[in-house]
Design a protein with these regions (language model features):
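A short, polar/charged loop-to-alpha-helix boundary motif
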Residues: 376-392
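Hydrophobic positions on the alpha1 helix immediately C-terminal to the Walker A/P-loop
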Residues: 185
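Flexible phosphate-sensing "switch/lid" loops adjacent to ATP/NTP-binding sites
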Residues: 1-174, 189-351, 356, 363-365, ...
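Flexible, solvent-exposed loop/hinge segments and secondary-structure transition points
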Residues: 392-393, 414
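Short clusters of small/polar residues that mark proteolytic maturation junctions
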Residues: 372-373
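The conserved Walker
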Residues: 177-178
Length: 493
């Protein structure tokens, strides 16, 4: 893989920037952490070289002076809201993230339940955490939020919230997902710190959009594609341009909210340290791109992937037409189309040649490998097997898992499970391959090579079953499907 981003430089430079911001506020900073602290696969795809856990690595550099506070909305607890990517509830994800941060040497400052009004499940959650020895604080709804600044920044507003006791210079405020109230927690703490005579500051950590890249740079356009379902946009920060004469890029919601946020800061401390939304940020990602061409190419590929994902969603659910339309426009902004990856045309050609579902994958060296539907293997299983054979140097015609192993599984699916689709899916093929490795060393080599396919792009001539797609994602393979279902079926998994 060609590298376009210096991860080590980023970790050092980002930690130094946060140190600098702490010192600007006299030694106490509340840092609102947006996006994913862990598993930031979007960033790693568009900035080749960026580690998915780079931000967590960076925080480890600050572990001796940092603590983490979690915000979670009481209504999300009450409604059992789940993370769409990993399927766990927000309530459980807070505990999962706590374990991860503690394992990395970071102190846990506690959990703030925002919008708390005595919701039964939120009360039970609070009791559960306190029984585990975790500090829990309640922040309450404020009438007229966020426009009624006189009430919000008063003893009857932020003053009613429970004060979060912190002991470190850096307080990282994070959450399991959007809408959890991170910003409100930070501002409430600024009010209550100020009331106690403690000088403290606020800053915002967001990876995207990258403020010091052009508005239409593919890295920033890829972020718009990733958030197309929200209907938001990257824009030039007008406040920064007016205050500093410098063109920077920011998120439209942050720009729209800035006047209110600035007024709140002025009400809390008498003056605002920031003249623009860009001023609030500490993001150093743009300074660590070492090969812009590589990052542009990777970002264009991601925009195309987002198009296929949105098109598949529209076909599966009938929802997301506006999202797809927006991504179409973004593709035009960076001059790409659906044929950006050579695997797209290759899979369509293979499907036309065989008359059945087919797939193609771009190998790490750029070679295109194909797979087709057969009696024993579905196209996703066939493609994965052929790709594994290629990366370890096994001839395509060499059998590393025999028909004698595969056929009984197909028979079981047909006779016992009464399934219409009897050919092996990707995970079943991998299990069969693993069993074959007992007697065939080549099969063992292929199983061990799955990590070599991480980051590869696979395309299929129609939408594949969700089980197959899930296995590809677990292996770190990017999947795109032509947004049509196989002909002749009304029900699709």
């Amino acid at each position: 893989m060609r590298i376009g981003f210096d991860n080590e430089k980023y970790i050092t430079m980002q930690a130094d920037r946060i140190h600098q911001r702490i010192s600007e506020f006299g030694g106490k900073l509340y840092l609102e952490f947006g996006g994913k602290l862990l598993d930031d696969n979007h960033a790693s795809r568009i900035l080749p070289g960026f580690a998915p856990d780079a931000k967590a690595q960076m925080l480890q550099q600050l572990a001796h002076e940092a603590e983490v506070v979690f915000a979670i909305n009481a209504n999300d607890i009450e409604n059992g809201k789940r993370r769409s990517d990993i399927g766990v509830t927000y309530a459980d994800d807070v505990l999962r993230l706590m374990d991860i941060f503690r394992a990395r040497g970071l102190a846990i400052g506690g959990v703030v339940i925002t919008q708390y009004s005595g919701q039964p499940k939120a009360k039970a959650y609070r009791a559960r955490l306190e029984n585990m020895g975790i500090a829990v604080y309640r922040h309450y709804p404020i009438e007229g939020y966020p426009s009624n600044i006189d009430l919000i920044v008063s003893a009857e507003g932020y003053g009613k919230n429970e004060y979060v006791k912190t002991t470190h210079p850096l307080v990282v405020v994070t959450a399991p997902g959007p809408g959890s109230g991170k910003l409100a927690v930070c501002l409430s703490q600024l009010y209550n710190e100020n009331a106690r005579g403690v000088r403290a500051g606020y800053a915002k950590f967001e990876t995207f959009p990258v403020w010091n890249l052009p508005l239409k740079h593919p890295v920033n356009v890829a972020y718009e594609a990733a958030t197309a379902d929200l209907g938001d946009n990257n824009i030039i920060d007008p406040y920064h341009l007016e205050a500093h004469g410098e063109v920077t890029v920011n998120y439209n919601r942050d720009v729209e909210a800035f006047p209110v946020l600035k007024a709140m800061m002025e009400k809390i401390a008498g003056t605002s340290p920031y003249q623009s939304p860009t001023d609030m940020g500490v993001n150093m990602v743009g300074n660590c791109i070492i090969d812009d061409a590589v990052c542009q190419e990777a970002s264009k590929a991601e925009i195309v992937r987002r198009w296929f994902r949105a098109a598949e969603k529209l076909e599966r659910t009938g929802m997301g037409e506006r999202e797809l339309t927006k991504i179409n426009l973004l593709m035009k902004d960076v001059n790409v189309d659906q044929n950006f990856s050579p695997a797209h045309a290759a899979c369509l050609h293979k499907a036309e040649e065989t008359g059945k579902l087919a797939g193609a994958m771009v190998m790490p060296d750029g070679t295109i490998i194909t797979g087709k539907t057969s009696e024993l293997l579905g196209a996703p299983a066939s493609l994965l097997l052929n790709a594994l054979k290629y990366v370890v140097g096994i001839e395509k015609k060499t059998f590393i898992v025999s028909d004698e192993v595969l056929r009984p599984i197909c028979t079981l699916k047909e006779n016992n499970f009464k399934l219409a689709r009897t050919s092996l899916c990707a995970d079943e093929m991998l299990i069969a391959l693993s069993i074959s490795s007992i007697t065939n060393p080549l099969a063992g080599k292929a199983v061990d090579a799955t990590q070599l396919l991480r980051g590869c792009d696979a395309y299929f001539s129609s939408i594949i079953p969700s089980d197959d797609e899930s296995i590809y994602h677990k292996l770190g393979i990017n999947v795109c499907c032509e947004p049509i279902f196989e002909q002749g079926h009304f029900f699709h998994q």
